[in-house]
Amino acid sequence: MIAGVDEAGRGAWIGNVVAAAVILPNDYDLPDLTDSKKLSAAKRERLCAAIYEQAIAVACAWCSPEEIDQLNIHYATLCAMKKAVITLKVAPTEVLIDGKFAPELPFPTRTIIGGDALEPAISAASIVAKVTRDKQMIALDALYPDYGFAAHKGYGTQKHQQALRQFGVLPLHRRSYAPIAALLKNNKK
């Protein structure tokens, strides 16, 4: 039972970093399964629903902006990945993680650079993590519509930068990120 693991939201300026772990059955039927970044939002949503229907186990976990600021994004990502794997309802025999780094886990673990496009279980985790984080950003957009989170998902786009200058830094912004830290520093002057 191979668990694929990936994250979403490392580079965003606001919100959680989300990790997902997915164990697929050998006979899964998920056409177009690939790296979430290569799929439209609608296709990701459809595949995510199918992954939840077909997977042996799916788990999502995240670290908050406060945890990101305390640990740094690298360790917060590893922490979210570990939480996702540990909360799977079925123990994996091996864990495949997208990227170069892996958290300490009680299971054999391998990292695969570009694994979200190479390993189906990692692709599935990529989709689940992205859809989960996007939903969090859409919910945040409902609370703070002036920031445009539904469109840019918290990344440092021009619209996000403009909203920050106009409306200020929110409690869920990652204060350790240089652009946010600079705004906070300038606002103290």
Swiss-Prot record:
Binding site residues for a divalent metal cation: D6, E7, D98
Superkingdom per UniProt: Bacteria
Keywords: Cytoplasm, Endonuclease, Hydrolase, Manganese, Metal-binding, Nuclease
SUPFAM superfamilies reported in the protein's UniProt record: Ribonuclease H-like (SSF53098)
GO-annotated cellular components: cytoplasm; ribonuclease H2 complex
EC number(s) on file: 3.1.26.4
GO biological process: one example: DNA replication, removal of RNA primer
Keyword hit for Cytoplasm: yes
GO molecular function: manganese ion binding; RNA binding; RNA-DNA hybrid ribonuclease activity
Cofactor: Mn(2+); Mg(2+)
Tagged with keyword Aminoacyl-tRNA synthetase: no
Catalytic activity field: Endonucleolytic cleavage to 5'-phosphomonoester
Subcellular location(s) of the protein: Cytoplasm
UniProt cross-references to NCBIfam families, sorted A to Z: PRK00015.1-3
PANTHER family noted in UniProt: RIBONUCLEASE H2 SUBUNIT A (PTHR10954), RIBONUCLEASE HII (PTHR10954:SF18)
Entry similarity comment: Belongs to the RNase HII family.
Function per UniProt: Endonuclease that specifically degrades the RNA of RNA-DNA hybrids.
Name of the protein this chain belongs to: Ribonuclease HII
Lineage, broadest ranks: Bacteria, Pseudomonadati, Pseudomonadota, Gammaproteobacteria, Cardiobacteriales
Gene: rnhB
